[in-house]
């Protein structure tokens, strides 16, 4: 597929080869996204090659890098939640390439999730493994059971992997995400640029929430000068029951 030539080249540079079915699904996803983007603001990136690099490839990189470069567990049928998924990144590309994962796409805006429900149906992403959308705020959905209404399922400490490309600072993002992670599970934060200062400012908060930074991996997207970073955090202890705090507080007053 000529339209995917650069994407395929970038994939080969990272030592993995997408199948024709995966490429077809990515193309269908792109077409659905750009069409829906005309009525609901999903992304400012709509050029096909840019979407391939900045959304598709970037979503996949942590999970396809050789383990001697980035020691992240390989995916099989683990339970994963994508917090603040937006237009479905990184969750949808990960589900396309790792179809057996049991994926929850969480966002606070129902309009985005309506789009993602359409994507799931159109791409038949529920053929293998589970996939669902979840509407709400992270501060409420990951609260301890005693703070939940009886009709709300318990999501706290129930996921093997939590991923997020949300733009919040790492301290705030950790308060959103770490409560969802099982003990010994992982939180993976995708970040733009260099993050040394941001990481240092978040170390105490991450520890307070029960996490430990395993690795910070800076990289440049293939055939570009675009700098990104991956922050890998492992859950070592249960998150104290007072976290996350009430909705809005993690962003207004980040833990330090």
Per-region residue spans from a language model:
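Class I SAM-dependent transferase core
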Residues: 2-75, 81, 111-131
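Residue-level signal for inorganic ion chemistry
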Residues: 33, 94, 191, 233
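Conserved SAM/SAH cofactor-binding pocket of Class I
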Residues: 60-168, 174-177
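Short alpha-helix immediately C-terminal to the canonical SAM-binding loop
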Residues: 112-114, 195, 199
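Short "lid" loop at the C-terminus of a central beta-strand within the Rossmann-like core
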Residues: 139, 192-196, 221
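Short strand-turn motif at the edge of the Rossmann-like AdoMet-binding core
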Residues: 167, 190-194, 218
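Helix-to-beta-strand junctions that scaffold the AdoMet/dcAdoMet cofactor pocket
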Residues: 181-183
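SAM/dcSAM-binding transferase cores
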Residues: 200-256
């Amino acid at each position: 597929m000529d339209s995917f030539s650069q994407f395929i080249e970038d994939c080969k540079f990272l030592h993995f080869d997408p199948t024709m079915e995966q490429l077809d699904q990515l193309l269908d996803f792109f077409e659905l996204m750009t069409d829906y983007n005309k009525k609901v603001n999903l992304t400012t990136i709509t050029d096909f090659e840019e979407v391939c690099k900045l959304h598709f490839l970037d979503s996949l990189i942590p999970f396809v890098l050789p383990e001697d470069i980035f020691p992240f567990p390989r995916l099989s049928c683990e339970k994963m939640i994508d917090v603040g998924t937006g237009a479905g990144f990184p969750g949808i590309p990960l589900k396309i390439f790792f179809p057996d994962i049991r994926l929850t796409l969480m966002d606070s805006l129902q309009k985005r999730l309506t789009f993602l429900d359409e994507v799931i149906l159109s791409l038949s992403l529920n053929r293998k493994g589970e996939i669902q959308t979840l509407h709400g705020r992270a501060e409420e959905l990951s609260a301890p059971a005693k703070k939940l209404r009886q009709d709300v399922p318990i999501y706290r400490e129930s996921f093997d992997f939590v991923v997020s490309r949300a733009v919040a600072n790492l301290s705030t993002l950790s308060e959103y995400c770490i409560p969802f992670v099982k003990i010994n599970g992982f939180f993976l934060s995708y970040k733009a640029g260099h993050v040394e200062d941001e990481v240092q400012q978040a170390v105490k908060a991450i520890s307070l929430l029960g996490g430990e930074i395993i690795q910070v991996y800076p990289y440049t997207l293939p055939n570009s000068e675009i700098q990104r970073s991956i922050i890998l955090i492992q859950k070592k202890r249960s998150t104290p029951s007072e976290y996350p705090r009430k909705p809005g507080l993690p962003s207004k007053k980040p833990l330090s």
